[in-house]
């Protein structure tokens, strides 16, 4: 096979993403799909939601915001902390044939682990080792790993991108677990040189204020939003909230908006020359505690913070406001001192044209606005799909659609019989965008049977239908006219070979219920 054809086939293969349901994962999934990258996701079902529902709710939110129908990833139901990530042999076979790289993003932000049989060790260290073993099992050598800038632990000064183990201490088990996981990734003998992303503290969306988790900066914002409104305003409308903070207020904090982090990682992931490097994804302009306080002052019309720096405060006279505030931020007290400086040479080389949004007063107010609307994570989520699954009946393969059929067919291939007239041989890909869509590879060898497997064809010359599922269902009659406007890799004169077989097959396999 020529280098050109190898490269072409590589572009048609899938990227396996872990952690797609987390904050950064939601944005990585969006940006990869918008970039036209074929994505498979490893997702764990919950007691209340199937894996398809979990991913569907994320994509429905993006579609409402972007006002565009997105492609659907191939969804693999599994568990990161289980052997082979909880995947079946058939799923592993599919990855072996269809996946070219892994973007391991999943992690748990737990600061204290009771023992190594619990979090954060189970996911951050054990889960990463399971992903490495899965790469060996499937023959994937291109691993992209989302670490954290804080594998540097308690180090000060300039932190080099290629530095890791210099005998540093750590503030908590989260930092140590991510350090150990990155060590495993770097030492893995069956990978090419891994690409490692080390984001700083991740905050919400710079444009909308959205977040799905309230850690880091949001812990402080939520606490302020809870405590300050309890204090009655004086005759001038000002709330006096006396509190002494053991800092100067000018200590730099490396905080980065999640949408920028995802945009940068997507750029680096798709830049061949960036492979094998380590990247500190940290801000152009650090945030300071004084800025956060002043921005919150202006939002809540309050005042009262005193910066004590290294001067010990007299704790005999502590206001109720101060006592409650300090008690609630104890887990982050180890971060009161200045952040180190993260070397960004590699980052600037490959993505220096993507500036990091500065967290200014307007953006911090946007974060506060979103937190208030979201009731700081307590608002009931209403993510009803545009097209309810009860309105659609499909025999195209889905992980939870027919467990017995999948057990007998090995998940990767399902045979569909049609009661219509015999079909001529054909091979197509279905890329059905929008609510409850998906990606499939359909092959008919003649007669009344066709084989369907998840994922798009890996051959560049196989025609692929790109269309929203709702549009396909609502316009069957229109689709009997020339279909080339909906297809990739198909010329108008080719329509007659598979137009009617396709529509005939879809009428049998995908219909609206009455």
Residue ranges, per PLM feature:
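N-terminal Rossmann/SDR dinucleotide-binding element
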Residues: 1-101, 105-108
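Amphipathic terminal alpha-helices
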Residues: 14, 31, 40-43, 341-398
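Conserved Rossmann-fold NAD(P)-dependent oxidoreductase catalytic core, especially the SDR/UDP-sugar
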Residues: 101-108, 112-118, 122, 126-176, ...
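NAD(P)-dependent short-chain dehydrogenase/reductase
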Residues: 157-158, 187-196, 200-253, 258-263, ...
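A hydrophobic C-terminal alpha-helical subdomain
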Residues: 227-235, 240-245, 312-355
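Mid/C-terminal beta-alpha module of Rossmann-like enzyme folds, strongest
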Residues: 264-331, 371-385, 432-435
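Feature captures hydrophobic
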Residues: 377-514
């Amino acid at each position: 096979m020529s280098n050109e054809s190898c490269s072409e086939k590589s572009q048609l293969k899938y990227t396996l993403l872990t952690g797609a349901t987390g904050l950064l994962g939601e944005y990585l999934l969006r940006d990869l799909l918008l970039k036209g990258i074929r994505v498979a996701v490893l997702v764990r079902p919950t007691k209340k939601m199937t894996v398809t529902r979990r991913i569907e709710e994320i994509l429905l939110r993006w579609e409402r915001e972007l006002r565009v129908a997105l492609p659907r990833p191939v969804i693999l139901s599994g568990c990161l902390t289980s052997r082979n990530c909880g995947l079946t042999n058939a799923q592993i076979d599919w990855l072996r044939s269809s996946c070219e790289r892994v973007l391991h993003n999943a992690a748990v932000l737990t600061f204290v682990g009771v023992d190594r049989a619990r979090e954060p060790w189970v996911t951050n260290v054990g889960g990463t080792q399971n992903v490495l073993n899965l790469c060996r099992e499937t023959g994937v050598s291109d691993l992209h790993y989302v670490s954290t800038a804080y594998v540097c632990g308690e180090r000060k000064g300039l932190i080099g991108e290629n530095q890791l183990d210099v005998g540093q201490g750590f503030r908590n088990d989260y930092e140590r677990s991510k350090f150990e996981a990155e060590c495993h990734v770097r030492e893995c003998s069956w990978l090419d040189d891994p690409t490692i992303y080390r984001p700083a503290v991740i905050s919400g969306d710079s444009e909308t204020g959205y977040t799905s988790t309230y850690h880091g900066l949001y812990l402080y914002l939520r606490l302020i939003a809870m405590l300050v409104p309890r204090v009655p305003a004086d005759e001038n409308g000002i709330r006096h909230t006396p509190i002494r903070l053991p800092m100067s207020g000018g200590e730099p904090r490396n905080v980065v908006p999640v949408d920028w982090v995802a945009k940068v990682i997507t750029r680096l992931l798709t830049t061949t020359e960036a492979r094998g490097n380590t990247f500190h994804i940290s801000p152009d302009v650090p945030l300071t505690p004084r800025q956060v306080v002043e921005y919150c002052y202006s939002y809540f019309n309050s005042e009262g913070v005193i910066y004590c720096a290294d001067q010990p405060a007299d704790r005999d006279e502590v206001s109720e406001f101060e006592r409650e505030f300090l008690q609630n931020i104890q887990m982050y007290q180890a971060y009161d001192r200045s952040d180190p400086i993260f070397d960004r040479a590699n980052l600037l080389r490959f993505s220096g044209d993507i500036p990091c949004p500065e967290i200014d007063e307007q953006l911090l107010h946007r974060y506060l606005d979103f937190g208030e609307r979201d009731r700081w994570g307590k608002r009931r989520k209403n993510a009803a799909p545009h097209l309810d699954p009860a309105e659609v009946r499909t025999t195209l393969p889905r992980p939870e659609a027919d467990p017995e059929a999948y057990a007998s067919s090995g998940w990767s291939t399902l045979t569909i019989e049609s009661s219509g007239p015999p079909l001529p041989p054909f091979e197509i890909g279905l890329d059905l965008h929008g609510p409850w869509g998906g990606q499939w590879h359909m092959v008919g060898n003649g007669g009344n049977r066709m084989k369907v497997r998840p994922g798009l064809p890996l051959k560049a010359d196989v025609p692929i239908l790109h269309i929203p599922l709702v549009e396909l269902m609502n316009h069957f009659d229109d689709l009997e006219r020339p279909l080339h406007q909906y297809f990739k890799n198909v010329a108008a004169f080719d329509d007659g070979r598979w137009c009617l077989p396709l529509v005939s097959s879809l009428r049998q396999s995908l219909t609206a219920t009455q």
